[in-house]
Amino acid sequence: MIGRGVCCRSFHTAGSAWKQFGFPKTQVTTIYNKTKSASNYKGYLKHRDAPGMYYQPSESIATGSVNSETIPRSFMAASDPRRGLDMPVQSTKAKQCPNVLVGKSTVNGKTYHLGPQEIDEIRKLRLDNPQKYTRKFLAAKYGISPLFVSMVSKPSEQHVQIMESRLQEIQSRWKEKRRIAREDRKRRKLLWYQA
């Protein structure tokens, strides 16, 4: 973390590849003791390096940091034999690219398979027995989303009152801290749309 953010210096100094290919030996240096104060970022910030550019390969390179395809030509030594090689152009082919990720609801695309009879049946079932025929149950039965079920049908007034009374009972057991937090949340939600 420290080496990447402070300056373009490399942690990769101990490898034989650096000596073999003549890369400049760069080291992350600090003004403090390296072993005892390695996590103290202030030492890395206060240290003054010689001006210039330092090549720091990414730790996540799959092919390794000594591969000629990943090292820019400007950072290769003048005597490096790989400098004369033709570098392949990074062209992404459609076969190599991953598929575009899609949401769960749009994997198979939207379907408009319900007719007026099915929608009337959904309304009737939800009005008759909302305890058994919940939105989730009806959505699974007809292959639609629970949101669509709530759009085309409403539960009975009696069921709505029962659910509201249950909610009031739960909220009556809330402590003062939770009640204040929920009120603050409601106020913040109102501010979302007042820009």
Curated annotation (Swiss-Prot):
It is found in: Mitochondrion. One of its GO terms (biological process) is mitochondrial translation. One of its GO terms (molecular function) is structural constituent of ribosome. One of its GO terms (cellular component) is mitochondrion. Transmembrane segments: none annotated. Residues 1-18 form a transit peptide. Keywords: Mitochondrion, Ribonucleoprotein, Ribosomal protein, Transit peptide. PANTHER family: 54S RIBOSOMAL PROTEIN L20, MITOCHONDRIAL (PTHR28266), LARGE RIBOSOMAL SUBUNIT PROTEIN ML58 (PTHR28266:SF1). Belongs to the mitochondrion-specific ribosomal protein mL58 family. Present with 350 molecules/cell in log phase SD medium. Component of the mitochondrial large ribosomal subunit (mt-LSU). Mature yeast 74S mitochondrial ribosomes consist of a small (37S) and a large (54S) subunit. The 37S small subunit contains a 15S ribosomal RNA (15S mt-rRNA) and 34 different proteins. The 54S large subunit contains a 21S rRNA (21S mt-rRNA) and 46 different proteins. Component of the mitochondrial ribosome (mitoribosome), a dedicated translation machinery responsible for the synthesis of mitochondrial genome-encoded proteins, including at least some of the essential transmembrane subunits of the mitochondrial respiratory chain. The mitoribosomes are attached to the mitochondrial inner membrane and translation products are cotranslationally integrated into the membrane. This is Large ribosomal subunit protein mL58. It comes from Saccharomyces cerevisiae (strain ATCC 204508 / S288c) (Baker's yeast).
